[in-house]
Design a protein with these regions (language model features):
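Active-site helix of classical SDR
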Residues: 45, 49-52
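Conserved Rossmann-fold NAD(P)-dependent oxidoreductase catalytic core, especially the SDR/UDP-sugar
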Residues: 3-44
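Conserved beta-loop-beta element that borders a ligand/cofactor-binding pocket
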Residues: 21-22, 54-79, 140
Length: 241
C-alpha cells in the first residue's frame, strides 16, 4: 500500500508526502523513551515493513524531487476505533471484554510499558507537518511521553473506570513482544507544537462511553492464523476472546 501511494505521489507531482510510520520501527532498545536518532531494530514483520516504507520514501524523494516527513505515532486510541478485533488495540479490547462481562487478558506478567496517544492530540501535529518546512525530511515521534503505564496497571485502571469487580487473566507472553516501548515527544514539541491535552484516564473514559453507546460486540476472527506452532499464543489458537 505504501509503495502504491508513493508511486501515485510521484506520478502526479505531489509536492510533499506525509508518511505515518509506527513505533514498531524501534523494536527492543536499551534506552527509553525512544528518540528519533536511535538505530531501528524492528522485532516483527509489521515493524520491518514500516521501516522499509520510510527508507523507500526517502529514496523516491531523492529520485522524484518531492518533500517528505516521516511521522511515528504510537498506540493511538480514541472513539470509533475498531474494538472487536482480537489481535490489536489493547485498550479497546479490554473495554469490550469487560463490557461483555469477561475479564481483561494480560500477556505475561503485564510489566510491558507503553504510552497511549489520544487521537485528538495526534491530528494537529499531522496537519502542522503538512505546512511546516522545518519538518521536511525529518522523522518525528507523535504522541505523549507522559502517562507511561504497564499493561497490568492499564487493565486495573480500565476496570476501575468501568466500576468492574472483575480481575485480569494472565496468560503466556506473546513472542517478539517488545517489553518497554514509549517515545520521546521533545522533537514534536519543538517542530510541530505537540501538546498532550487528553490524559489517559480521560481517553479511556471517552472510548468506554462510546462503546457503551454503540454497544459491545463479540470479537470477530476474519482469517485463520496462517502458521501455528508452539509459540502461537493460546488466546489465538483457542480464540479465547
Amino acid at each position: 500500500i505504501s509503495m502504491a501511494v508513493f508511486t501515485a505521489a510521484a506520478e502526479n507531482k505531489v509536492p510533499k508526502v506525509i508518511n505515518c510510520s509506527s513505533m514498531a520501527r524501534y523494536g527492543e532498545q536499551d534506552i527509553t523513551p525512544f528518540t528519533e536518532d536511535l538505530l531501528p531494530k524492528p522485532q516483527d514483520p509489521y515493524g520491518i515493513a514500516k521501516l522499509a516504507s520510510e527508507q523507500t520514501l526517502e529514496v523516491m524523494s531523492n529520485v522524484h524531487g518531492f518533500d517528505f516527513v516521516n511521522l511515528v505515532p504510537h498506540n493511538i486510541i480514541g472513539p470509533r476505533q475498531k474494538y472487536d478485533d482480537p489481535y490489536r488495540n489493547v485498550v479497546s479490547i479490554m473495554i469490550n471484554r469487560i463490557l461483555n462481562g469477561n475479564p481483561p487478558i494480560v500477556y505475561g506478567d503485564g510489566s510491558q510499558e507503553r504510552c497511549f496517544s489520544d487521537i485528538e492530540d495526534v491530528v494537529n501535529p499531522i496537519i502542522e507537518s503538512i505546512h511546516n518546512e522545518k519538518a521536511v525530511g525529518e522523522t518525528i515521534n507523535i504522541g505523549p511521553d507522559e502517562d507511561v503505564i504497564s499493561i497490568k496497571d492499564l487493565s486495573y485502571k480500565i476496570l476501575k473506570i468501568l466500576s468492574s469487580d472483575l480481575e485480569p487473566i494472565f496468560v503466556d507472553p506473546r513472542p517478539q513482544e517488545v517489553k518497554i516501548a514509549h517515545c520521546s515527544a521533545d522533537k514534536s514539541r519543538k517542530l510541530l507544537g505537540y501538546d498532550t491535552t487528553v490524559n489517559l484516564d480521560a481517553s479511556i473514559t471517552k472510548i468506554a462511553n462510546w462503546i457503551i453507546e454503540v454497544g459491545p460486540k463479540k470479537f470477530r476472527y476474519h482469517l485463520d492464523i496462517e502458521i501455528l506452532n508452539e509459540k502461537t499464543p493460546k488466546t489465538w489458537k483457542d480464540r479465547m476472546f
